[in-house]
């Protein structure tokens, strides 16, 4: 009784009498009538109702006259005569439109079971598909209870003599059903219920003194004795899945719940129980105060009908009484259409309509019963948004009462639904750092925190100086356990001075840039930073060395240089003292790291020399920088021996062949540092012979001038002319060098004699004896050439006269063809044949095979073609001469015209490569004469 009195009572149901329908509009029972219909009468059922049930959209009643009545939602009562005497039991299936009834058709104890198919009709009444006697044997006994399995394969009937019969098979047909006695006992059976769990079917049997269960889906029907306490008629029920389909037995002292194999919890609801019913998670108990005891426990519902009876609706999960009211003489409690209906002995039907969830919650809120509201919302399957709203209101209530610890626990339950800033603002204003920390921790744990939340939580830890919590927060075992923005955490910890914690996060979560920033800028641990870079993958090691290389080079130059050497040759990340030497290495572009060595020339030289030795294919910038560095060292060195060594190194580098494509850059470097040997070497490699000559001339190195001419004069003959001009301007006695130059000029015929004389005329020390031998030899050669030319002219004139005579003879005299052999095949000439005026004759088939033109002699055609090409060239050159003279006269810039013609090669000497030596003279003949010569080869007929 004490436990029962502690349960709170609420009015979560609305009670009203069901009225008769005003029209056939299908209004729900218990609905409030419209205004103006106050005269509506309350619904009154026929007298003598003894049993009730519900399902399939109707309330079903049985009376003492043998009739069964149906009350659908339209409240249009209908019935039919089911038995001749009375109806004692009804069971309406919920999943099938099948009704099972027990009644009497004759006097005496002979109950009949009838199965009705409500979907089929027989003379306007439901079709009775099966009738059989309830008593299996010959001993008369009264039926006390009835239950049917929803699969229509089991039906159990309990009797007052303590026996239970089980009908197994299709209960709607006689031939498919088998009846047997399942249970025999000494106490009246007061309740039966089937429970289906997977493929196993249990039958609960309760009597006035005990509770037991059977497995009826097998063959042997094993029995389990559950308890030695029983209950009265209609005081047992089967719960829904919310209570795990437990069998409820309502005794006078307690209400017990049973599983098929054991007893479950019990509730101390005192009072003499009359009815037990289960409805949508609620336990409905109709009881009478124990102060008014009935004459018989088994037949108490029929005694003292004028007593007041209490109906309580219990919420067993949330442990409160959802509704409590008083009725006079309750016949039964039914559930249909989402409501409860209470039938009283006076024929009235009372509707108990459950309030909606929001209304119930508001009632609890008004009483500040938030815990109960939460439990209720969960049992009513309220969505997460609705629950979050309750948690928020509960938290606000606790916060207003000063219970900050309790409030934050409720706010934590709103995470994911309630905006975090709402909670954060409350605890920031109240300076409740501990509570705020708890909320933020959970926010991160659920991976719903942003960068601002992480910042705030870490600030809370630092203000509380709670290093243990801070370490617990950041030191997670795996990446999946991290519920915060790591980069934000690193920033906050760094700003707060928790460098070791920030380093831990940066290293474990691969935030390499932050790790190096803290090591280099805050802790100044350059060795550790360099070691860390050496462990990184190639791409990250490369990028971080470019970013932090200058700082590291400034503080630890040797170690930094060593790492750069490895990075640019064959880089493999170090893995805690070991490295995978078999894995293929990577290498960076060494040229990109040269700026890191600013102000560290010693390390730069070591790096560059290492790269040039280990990787000869290093970028050109490596060699350019190394050359510049060596030249700088050479220029600033004072020690002669060291300077000579540096000189050799620079020359060796220049001769390595790495500066062919960057000749100009290397030359500029050598000139900047006055490295003359390098300049001369590069001049020679670049074929800049003029510059070599000028260098030796500037330094008056006469022998070197002659040497340059001898070595490179074949490639650039103008060197000899420049040498002659150079020595001619010298006032010193340079006869030896002038003679050497003149000898070469004479041999190669590089200058006209007059120009040689004019050039040497500028030298006051040069006498006629210097050039006497040269002039004599030149005059002799010219005399010989003149004699040869005169002889050639006479010969050509005679040849011209002869040819003209032949032409005249061809024009004036007949031509006799006396050739006897073909000029192509040298065989005897036969008809048909082809003859030409030039004297050549051919077989016709030979001519057709070898001739390129029908009008030209195949034998003379090559020579004739040369002559024609020469004529065309002369005519073209004459036309160009006229055009050139015209443009020269009309142009304002004569020099540009001349330059344009030079660029087009107009003034180049015309030479036909196929011409024999005699062709040069032929080219001087008149064009008209040349055309006449071609007549020798015209075809004769």
Swiss-Prot record:
GO biological process, one term: negative regulation of intracellular estrogen receptor signaling pathway
Tissue specificity of this protein: Ubiquitous. Expression was highest in heart and low in lung.
Zinc fingers, RING-type class: 822-861
Principal location listed in the UniProt entry: other
Homology family: Belongs to the VPS11 family.
Function according to Swiss-Prot or TrEMBL: Plays a role in vesicle-mediated protein trafficking to lysosomal compartments including the endocytic membrane transport and autophagic pathways. Believed to act as a core component of the putative HOPS and CORVET endosomal tethering complexes which are proposed to be involved in the Rab5-to-Rab7 endosome conversion probably implicating MON1A/B, and via binding SNAREs and SNARE complexes to mediate tethering and docking events during SNARE-mediated membrane fusion.
Designated name of the protein: Vacuolar protein sorting-associated protein 11 homolog
Lineage: Eukaryota, Metazoa, Chordata, Craniata, Vertebrata
């Amino acid at each position: 009784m004490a436990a029962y009195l502690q349960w709170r009572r609420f009015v979560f149901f609305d009670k009203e009498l069901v009225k008769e329908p005003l029209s056939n509009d299908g209004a729900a029972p218990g609905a409030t009538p419209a205004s103006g219909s106050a005269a509506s009468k309350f619904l009154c059922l026929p007298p003598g109702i003894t049993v009730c049930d519900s399902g399939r959209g109707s309330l079903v009643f049985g009376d003492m006259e043998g009739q069964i009545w149906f009350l659908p939602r339209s409240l249009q009562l209908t019935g039919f005569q089911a038995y001749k005497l009375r109806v004692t039991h009804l069971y309406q299936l919920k999943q099938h439109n099948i009704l099972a009834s027990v009644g009497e058709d004759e006097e005496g104890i002979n109950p009949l079971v009838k199965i009705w198919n409500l979907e089929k009709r027989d003379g306007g009444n439901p079709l009775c598909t099966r009738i059989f006697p309830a008593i299996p044997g010959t001993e008369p006994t009264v039926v006390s209870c009835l239950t049917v399995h929803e699969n229509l394969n089991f039906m159990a009937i309990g009797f007052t003599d303590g026996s239970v019969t089980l009908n197994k098979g299709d209960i709607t047909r006689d031939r498919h059903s088998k009846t047997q006695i399942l249970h025999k006992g000494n106490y009246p059976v007061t309740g039966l219920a089937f429970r289906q769990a997977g493929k196993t079917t249990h039958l609960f049997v309760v009597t006035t003194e005990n509770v037991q269960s059977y497995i009826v889906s097998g063959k042997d029907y094993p029995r389990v004795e559950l308890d030695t306490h029983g209950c009265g008629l209609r005081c047992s029920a089967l719960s829904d899945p919310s209570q795990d389909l437990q069998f409820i037995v309502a005794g006078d002292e307690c209400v017990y719940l049973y599983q098929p194999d054991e007893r479950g919890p019990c509730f101390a609801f005192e009072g003499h129980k009359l009815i037990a019913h289960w409805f949508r998670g609620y336990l409905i108990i109709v009881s009478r105060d124990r102060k008014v005891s009935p004459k018989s426990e088994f037949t108490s519902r029929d005694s003292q009908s004028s007593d007041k009876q209490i109906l309580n609706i219990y919420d067993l999960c949330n442990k409160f009484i959802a509704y409590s009211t008083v009725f006079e003489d309750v016949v039964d409690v039914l559930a249909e259409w989402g409501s409860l209906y209470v039938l009283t002995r006076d024929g009235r039907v009372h509707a108990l309509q459950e309030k909606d969830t929001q209304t119930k919650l508001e009632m609890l809120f008004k009483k500040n019963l938030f815990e109960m509201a939460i439990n209720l919302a969960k049992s009513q399957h309220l969505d997460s948004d609705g629950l979050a709203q309750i948690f928020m209101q509960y938290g606000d209530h606790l916060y207003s009462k000063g219970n900050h610890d309790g409030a934050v626990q409720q706010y934590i339950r709103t995470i994911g639904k309630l905006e975090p800033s709402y909670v954060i603002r409350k605890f920031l204003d109240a300076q409740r750092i501990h509570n705020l920390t708890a909320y933020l921790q959970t926010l991160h744990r659920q991976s719903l925190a942003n960068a601002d939340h992480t910042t705030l939580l870490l600030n809370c830890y630092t203000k509380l100086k709670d290093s243990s919590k801070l370490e617990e927060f950041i030191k997670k075992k795996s990446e999946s356990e991290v519920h915060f923005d790591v980069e934000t955490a690193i920033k906050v910890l760094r700003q707060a001075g928790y460098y070791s914690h920030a380093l831990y996060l940066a290293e474990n979560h691969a935030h390499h840039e932050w790790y190096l920033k803290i090591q280099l800028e805050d802790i100044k641990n350059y060795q550790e930073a360099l070691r860390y870079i050496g462990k990184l993958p190639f791409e990250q090691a490369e990028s971080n060395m470019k970013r932090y290389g200058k700082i590291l080079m400034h503080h630890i130059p040797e170690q930094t240089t060593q790492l750069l050497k490895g990075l640019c040759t064959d880089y493999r990340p170090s893995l805690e003292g070991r490295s995978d030497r078999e894995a293929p290495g990577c290498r960076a572009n060494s040229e990109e790291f040269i700026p890191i060595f600013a102000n560290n020339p010693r390390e730069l030289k070591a790096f560059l020399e290492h790269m040039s030795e280990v990787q000869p294919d290093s970028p050109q910038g490596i060699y350019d920088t190394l050359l510049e560095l060596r030249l700088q060292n050479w220029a600033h060195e004072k020690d002669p021996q060291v300077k000579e060594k540096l000189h050799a190194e620079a020359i060796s580098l220049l001769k390595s062949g790495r500066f062919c494509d960057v000749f100009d850059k290397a030359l500029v470097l050598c000139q900047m540092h006055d490295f003359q040997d390098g300049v001369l070497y590069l001049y020679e490699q670049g074929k800049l012979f003029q510059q070599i000559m000028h260098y030796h001339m500037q330094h008056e190195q006469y022998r070197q001038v002659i040497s340059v001419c001898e070595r490179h004069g074949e490639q650039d003959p103008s060197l000899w002319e420049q040498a002659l001009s150079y020595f001619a301007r010298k006032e010193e006695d340079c006869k030896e060098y002038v003679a050497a130059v003149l000898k070469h000029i004479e041999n190669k015929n590089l200058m006209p004699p007059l120009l040689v004389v004019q050039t040497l005329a500028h030298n006051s020390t040069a006498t006629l004896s210097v050039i006497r031998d040269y002039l004599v030899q030149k005059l002799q050669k010219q005399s010989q050439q003149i004699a040869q030319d005169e002889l050639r002219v006479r010969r050509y004139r005679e040849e011209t006269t002869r040819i003209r005579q032949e032409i005249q003879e061809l024009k004036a005299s007949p031509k006799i063809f006396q050739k006897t052999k073909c000029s192509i095949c040298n065989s005897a000439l036969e008809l048909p044949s082809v003859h030409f005026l030039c004297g050549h004759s051919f077989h016709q088939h030979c001519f057709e095979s070898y001739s390129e033109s029908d009008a030209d002699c195949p034998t003379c055609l090559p020579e004739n073609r040369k002559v024609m090409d020469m004529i065309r060239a002369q005519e073209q050159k004459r036309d160009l001469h006229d055009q050139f003279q015209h443009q020269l006269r009309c142009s304002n810039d004569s020099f540009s015209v001349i330059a344009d013609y030079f660029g087009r090669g107009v003034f180049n000497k015309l030479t036909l490569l196929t011409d024999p030596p005699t062709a040069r003279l032929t080219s001087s003949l008149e064009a008209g004469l040349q055309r006449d010569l071609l007549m020798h080869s015209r075809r004769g007929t």
